[in-house]
A protein has these predicted regions:
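Phosphate- and other anionic-substrate recognition elements at nucleic-acid/protein interfaces
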Residues: 1-19, 26-160
Length: 160
């Protein structure tokens, strides 16, 4: 498998859900789509201990949920340039592909944590509960933004 652009990624997804990963230094937020690829929902937060454990946890989700592809948040700088976090994200994706063959694509994650934080402020959750959910909510925001573009048939704009 390889890392695909958006159009080619969606051509590989047939009757499957997709997950989105928001990679952080300590945690990975995970969101999941419905099978119709319309809606994203926060799924869980995985604590990053070591790569082997992370792969095992992600593989378990992939197999349990019938996942056909993975979207990974692409951490561009606010001005749209790639920084060192893009390098580590790319390295993670390639390392994961060596362990598990599944279509992967990147999607712009700029402002996802801010959007997730703002959304969680609207809830009645306590601060610690919000912190536990933040990364998964950010992943769902990233995934929903891609699903919205996909469902509006505007993927070519992203691959421009």
């Amino acid at each position: 498998m390889t890392i695909y652009n958006h159009v080619n990624f969606f051509s590989k997804i047939v009757n499957n859900k997709i997950i989105c990963l928001d990679l952080g230094d300590k945690n990975i937020g995970v969101a999941i789509s419905d099978q119709g690829l319309k809606f994203a929902n926060p799924l869980k937060v995985i604590k990053r201990k070591n790569f082997k454990t992370t792969v095992e946890k992600l593989t378990s989700i992939i197999e349990l949920e019938n996942i056909g592809g993975i979207v990974i948040g692409w951490p561009l700088n606010i001005d749209g340039t790639q920084g060192p976090r893009c390098d580590s994200t790319r390295d993670f994706a390639h390392a994961f592909l060596r362990k598990y063959k599944i279509p992967i694509c990147f999607h712009d994650e700029r402002l996802s944590s801010i959007a997730a934080d703002n959304l969680l402020k609207e809830t009645n959750l306590k601060r610690k509960q919000k912190e536990k959910k933040l990364d998964a909510v950010a992943a769902s925001w990233i995934l929903q933004s891609l699903l919205d573009v996909y469902n509006n048939k505007n993927l070519e704009v992203l691959n421009g």
